[in-house]
């Protein structure tokens, strides 16, 4: 792959990463609030219907935990790859810290300074969690020059984008997410009935 083509593909993947990361964060937020409503509403409906939990009825093998989506899985890297990623992440974090340092923000408005401070906090959190892809997004937002792309960078970005995309799609297929999109109580109760059947809730005898 030519250097020009590699650079353009890298830029494309970074843009996709920024969108997917924002979309993933949005889905996590929506899922988190919807899960609480789902659990409370289902428990109320279950009691009204006189259903026992699988554990109470001892009608299934084992106990089925509450439905949860699988979080983004960390890419399995060999030691050399990990070291290279950590080196790039460290460089990016230092550049972000420099760009968001209070001494560099004196010419900005109070609102802009607050935004930069929040970006630094997010970058520090991402750095401690080894979430290099979030550092990449923050660096892009700050117009910080990114590392010269390599084929390895392309592969890592493609893998991370795929993981984010798969996680988002999985969340959208969960009962919690579908419940949150239901237009009325009747459709929600139909969903509860299906959920109860799949998980193994049974009527009181």
Q: Can you annotate each of these PLM segments?
A:
Residues 1-205:
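C-terminal accessory/regulatory regions appended to core domains
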């Amino acid at each position: 792959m030519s250097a020009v083509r590699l650079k353009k593909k890298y830029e494309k993947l970074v843009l996709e990463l920024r969108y997917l990361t924002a979309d993933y964060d949005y889905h996590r937020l929506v899922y988190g609030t919807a899960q609480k409503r789902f659990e409370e509403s289902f428990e109320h409906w279950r009691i009204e219907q006189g259903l026992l939990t699988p554990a109470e009825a001892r009608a299934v093998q084992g106990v089925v935990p509450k439905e949860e989506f699988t979080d983004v899985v960390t890419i399995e890297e060999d030691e050399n790859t990990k070291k290279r990623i950590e080196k790039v992440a460290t460089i990016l974090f230092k550049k972000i810290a420099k760009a968001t340092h209070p001494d560099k923000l004196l010419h900005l408005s109070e609102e802009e300074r607050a935004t930069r401070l929040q970006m630094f906090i997010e970058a520090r959190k991402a750095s401690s969690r080894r979430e290099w892809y979030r550092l990449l997004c923050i660096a892009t937002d700050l117009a910080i020059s990114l590392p010269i792309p390599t084929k390895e960078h392309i592969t890592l970005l493609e893998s991370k984008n795929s993981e984010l995309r798969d996680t988002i799609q999985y969340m959208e297929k969960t009962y919690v997410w579908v419940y949150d999109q239901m237009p009325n109580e009747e459709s929600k109760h139909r969903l509860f009935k299906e959920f109860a059947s799949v998980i193994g809730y049974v009527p009181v005898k």
